Amino acid sequence: MSGLFETLGRRALFTFDAEQAHGLSITGLKTGIVTCRTPEDPALSVKVAGLKFPNPLGMAAGYDKNAEVPDALLKLGFGFAEVGTLTPRPQSGNPRPRIFRLVDDKAVINRLGFNNEGHEAAFKRLSRRAGKSGIVGVNIGANKDAEDRIADYVAGIRRFYLLARYFTVNISSPNTPGLRNLQAREALHELLSRVLEARDEEGNMCTLKRPVFLKIAPDLTDEELDDIAAEADAQKLDGIIVSNTTLSRSGLKNPENSNETGGLSGAPLFERSTVVLARMRERVGPDMPLIGVGGIDSAETALAKIKAGADLVQLYTGLIYRGPGLPGEILRGLSTAIKHEGVSSIAELRDRDTKEWAARKLIS
């Protein structure tokens, strides 16, 4: 399926502007035109932060920004889907054009700026799937013009508490001015304190404890990673997602669009994000869940993330270039890898290559 998409489907979609093509793909999922049969393998199931995932492969936030097609994404084979980023009030994001394909690099640069329809629209959609099976997480953010950005994250926790299976606190988008400053130790302490307090208050009212993950940037120094790891441990955070898009343009082949402002995702992000993942694993130890994101476009790259220290992995840009058959292809490859490695579960392969990845040098 992914091979057919690369020769025919992608060619057709790429005749459209990137944002139009994205809209068409959402429509295709809504109408049921896009379907894929995917394998189920008990050896791929993994328990993370109290949740049992049927497999470790998830759809990253940014694709289904407004919670329109989470169940359709699960039907493609994803073990979980993350909607958002959602802000309390609707916002249009940055001016177009704001998504740029780098085809030779199998990459994308975006400067969308948290464009979304806001909490209310997503709440109505997610309410319609209440009670359905499948793990759907909610990625929460802050409005660009918010006077108290942390209050926006707290509002997201409270609004979606009964509907989200987990939350991701996104403070690492490079496209909202000043947002990444929340990764600094003092700001992060206040953010996590208030967010986790809201989570605990909501949980006490309904006896459900929703995990909260923190999504970080790949452009952090070792000292910044130290601070985040220490704060995550002190606050008893449920997990860390490594990583968001990068500001680095290292190693790009495609001169066209490479100088555009925004975050780079796709194949060129794989090395950097995997090194940062492994370094974070060394800092947080074996018990804290880590979710690896960045450059996953095959079973090999998904497995590399797991061996570098990821409990779960997510992709997005790989789907743009490989098509809706990619999740099934990755899951089949992971099942084969489990047999080849002589283990009974994908979880047994975690951390096999952490030291080697953490020791790699990053090029700015």
Curated annotation (Swiss-Prot):
Domain of life: Bacteria
GO molecular function: dihydroorotate dehydrogenase (quinone) activity
Residues that hold FMN according to the record: A61, G62, Y63, D64, K65, T85, N139, N170, K215, S243, G266, G295, Y316, T317
Cofactor or coenzyme needed: FMN
Keyword Membrane assigned: yes
Gene Ontology cellular component annotations, sorted alphabetically: cytoplasm; plasma membrane
Name by which UniProt lists this protein: Dihydroorotate dehydrogenase (quinone)
Organism: Brucella abortus (strain 2308)
Lineage: Bacteria, Pseudomonadati, Pseudomonadota, Alphaproteobacteria, Hyphomicrobiales
